[in-house]
Curated annotation (Swiss-Prot):
Any one Gene Ontology BP term: lysine biosynthetic process via diaminopimelate
PROSITE patterns: ARGE_DAPE_CPG2_2
Note on cofactor: Binds 2 Zn(2+) or Co(2+) ions per subunit.
HAMAP family: DapE (MF_01690)
Alphabetically ordered keywords of this record: Amino-acid biosynthesis, Cobalt, Diaminopimelate biosynthesis, Hydrolase, Lysine biosynthesis, Metal-binding, Zinc
Family listed: Belongs to the peptidase M20A family. DapE subfamily.
Recorded name of the encoding gene: dapE
Protein name: Succinyl-diaminopimelate desuccinylase
Binding residues annotated for Zn(2+) 1, in chain numbering: H71, D104, E167
CDD domains: M20_DapE_proteobac
Species this protein is from: Shewanella piezotolerans (strain WP3 / JCM 13877)
Catalytic-site annotation from UniProt: D73, E138
Hydrolase is among the record's keywords: yes
Amino acid sequence: MSQFNNSPVLALAKDLISRPSVTPLDEGCQTLMADRLKDAGFNIEDMVFEDTTNMWARKGTQSPVFCFAGHTDVVPVGDLNRWHTPPFEPVVIDDYLHGRGAADMKGSLAAMVVATERFVKKHPDHKGSIAFLITSDEEGPFINGTTRVIDTLEARNEKITWSLVGEPSSTHKLGDIVKNGRRGSLTGNLTVKGMQGHVAYPHLADNPIHKASPALDELARMKWDNGNEFFPPTSFQIANINGGTGASNVIPGTLEVMFNFRYSTEVTAEILIERVLNILDAHGLDYDINWIFNGLPFLTGDGPLLDATRDAIKKVTGLDTDPQTSGGTSDGRFIAPTGAHVLELGPVNATIHKVNECVKVSDLEQLTLCYEAILENLLCQ
């Protein structure tokens, strides 16, 4: 461990982890980052929307604009008794930094700041601009976070050229995978109406569970598309289903079903909605349904950002990275629709959202070098 005793990225990561910023709280994390970025020549703009703290920091006024994006909020710690160390008291054990947010994603935030400090010091006359878009609402309802900041930037025609999101993209080794896209996400909340009654008198009631079951089975078996070379086929999953009073002798009056699509670029949300409604109507259901659009699919193909990232990872780690679109959503889905090219590169994701979350300190050192090399590849050429 002695080799990391004076590590600036480790020190900053510890400072960030020690702040219990359970979503949507920030607990001063952004101020900690802002103070460092001010010293590096950044202008800081705080954007607070209701319960969410956001920061837009920018150095430079010219294009192209390279933007680090990330979040200071973390998920709840869960059962404290299952943690080997207190989740907000960061400690290093055998090269692993332990604490909530170590991998998702305070380690990445520390690497971003330190990499930027080093880059600006080495290249004070770099081309273009560097920006940070940081929110405390990524792990929560994502209403007042990145999406609101993007709306503000769009309203004043402030554009991002390239964005690197620090989500933990790696699977086995740092840099083995980068995310160059994400599937779209669409949630449906369905209420099927029936008539409550006694189970002994079914002719006097109307069981919504029985009525809805064939339609739900058809939805679950439906092949929505074949996917493509970048995305797997669209997935339909029932996430929650609730009906009944808890009594064994009562036919329920309603059935509530929550389902989610993770969809490829082969379909649109509008097409999925139309097909779902056609199936529900074909089964003669009496229902209400509302939809939540969680994000459009996006894909960043070959180009300067992906090339710069591939080169940096190869230079630092020796790995040939594999661009993938698998996994959940990230705030990249709010940045990509502006026309920006978006990638995700961060630590190994094996312990994210789990008890005893941790990250290799040596990986944070390498991640910092990767971020710095990406800046050099894009803004010094």
